[in-house]
């Protein structure tokens, strides 16, 4: 009788242990984010921009296979009411405004964690891994999300474009990390005749590689410092407008250029964010950004920005952030200065509201923009 009781208890414990293992497995995750943005140049013109993002991750362990790996899928759709932008600024004051785009693959690939190393292969975009620091992510100007020394000089996988990529991340320790991303040298618009976002053509498009080392402070004050470089090699140089050319036209231009001359282009960047003060719910910090590219082969040669972020100033909790940033971009034909003042308030875990004001001077042209962004996510 005693043996039977002990045996029964052992079976129960083993079954409970098995259940714990099952419940500990990662489950698939699905998220939806809808962003609405209203833009106005103070009464003359209006624009309404919509961005819908659907994302899913499926752990391999959930499929009964190995651990620490997952399939990643994300699709986006963009719609706006005005075909023309309400401002002619070069840096682009809205980081979500693009031409209308039906659902398009944004991320599609497989990632594997091996110790301190993360590997990814598939369709990807640079917005997933670079220029995503906490302070910079607050602002709505496109230059804060990716510097114009990259977005204006390369046809790279920048929102809403994606390209085939091999991505690697390595955490040296809790403070220092390294990233490297190797992309096809040109990103293509989806659903365009004669082009494919899954194109891998180094001979025609070249190769584009991004590398970055980051340092994060591990004390009570948040701080992030990044140093990066992008290198592009191909038979021809292009700019961001090339993404609207069909691949046949790009091929023809490539054949005209000498195949014997493999040309290299590059840009470097440096960014710093540091929280400087904290008292109760209040906190304040500063950020700085700088990037340069060779002036003899690029449209945008210099970019510099500086600003501050203040939390808890306008609400009873730290669910709000007030940001001010000034940026200057030097292009081959004009210099542009932009000032953004924005406030982001998190109403709930699923709802945020963010008004922003942009004051821009592009050469002799001036633009004043007011916008309201609302984000709903689940």
Question: What is each model feature region?
Answer:
Residues 21-29, 42-43, 57-71, 116, ...:
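Short loop/turn motifs that connect adjacent beta-strands in outer-membrane beta-barrel proteins
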Residues 23-41, 71-73, 81, 142, ...:
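Transmembrane beta-strand segments of Gram-negative outer membrane beta-barrel proteins
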Residues 30-32, 71-75, 119-121, 168, ...:
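Membrane-embedded beta-strand positions of outer-membrane beta-barrel proteins
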Residues 49, 103, 161, 206-208, ...:
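Membrane-spanning beta-strands of outer-membrane beta-barrel proteins
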Residues 193, 197-202, 212-214, 228-262, ...:
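Outer membrane beta-barrel transmembrane domains
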Residues 1-25:
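Cleavable N-terminal export/targeting peptides
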Residues 53, 58-185, 298-307, 311-333:
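Outer membrane beta-barrel
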Residues 366-378:
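Outer-membrane beta-barrel "beta-signal"
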């Amino acid at each position: 009788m005693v043996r039977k009781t002990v045996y029964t208890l052992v079976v129960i414990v083993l079954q409970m242990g098995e259940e714990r293992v099952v419940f500990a497995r990662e489950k698939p995750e699905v998220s939806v984010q809808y962003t609405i943005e209203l833009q106005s140049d103070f009464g003359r013109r209006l624009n309404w921009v919509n961005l819908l993002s659907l994302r899913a991750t499926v752990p391999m362990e959930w499929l009964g296979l190995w651990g620490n790996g997952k399939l990643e899928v994300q699709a986006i759709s963009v719609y706006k009411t005005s075909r023309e932008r309400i401002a002619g600024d070069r840096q682009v004051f809205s980081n979500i405004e693009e031409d209308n785009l039906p659902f398009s693959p944004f991320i599609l690939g497989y990632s594997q964690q091996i110790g301190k190393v993360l590997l990814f292969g598939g369709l990807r975009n640079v917005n997933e891994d670079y220029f995503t620091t906490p302070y910079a992510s607050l602002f709505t100007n496109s230059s804060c999300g990716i510097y114009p020394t990259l977005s204006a000089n390369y046809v790279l996988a920048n929102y809403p474009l994606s390209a085939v990529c091999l991505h690697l991340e390595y955490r040296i320790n809790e403070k220092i990390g390294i990233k490297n991303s190797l992309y096809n040298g040109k990103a293509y618009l989806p659903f365009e005749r004669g082009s494919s976002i899954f194109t891998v053509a180094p001979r025609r498009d070249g190769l584009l590689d991004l590398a970055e080392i980051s340092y994060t402070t591990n004390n009570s004050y948040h701080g992030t410092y990044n140093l990066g470089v992008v290198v592009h090699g191909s038979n021809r140089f292009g700019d961001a407008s090339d993404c609207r050319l069909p691949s046949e036209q790009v091929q023809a231009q490539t054949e005209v250029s000498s195949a014997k001359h493999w040309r290299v282009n590059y840009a470097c960047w440096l960014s710093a964010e540091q929280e400087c003060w904290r008292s109760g719910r209040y906190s304040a910090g500063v950020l700085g950004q700088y990037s340069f590219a060779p002036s003899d082969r690029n449209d945008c040669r210099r970019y510099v920005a500086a600003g501050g972020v203040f939390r808890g100033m306008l609400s009873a909790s730290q669910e709000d952030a007030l940001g001010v940033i000034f940026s200057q971009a030097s292009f081959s034909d004009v210099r542009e200065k932009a000032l953004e003042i924005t406030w982001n308030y998190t109403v709930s875990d699923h709802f945020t509201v963010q008004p922003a004001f942009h004051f821009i001077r592009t050469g002799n042209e001036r633009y004043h923009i007011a916008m309201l962004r609302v984000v709903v996510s689940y």
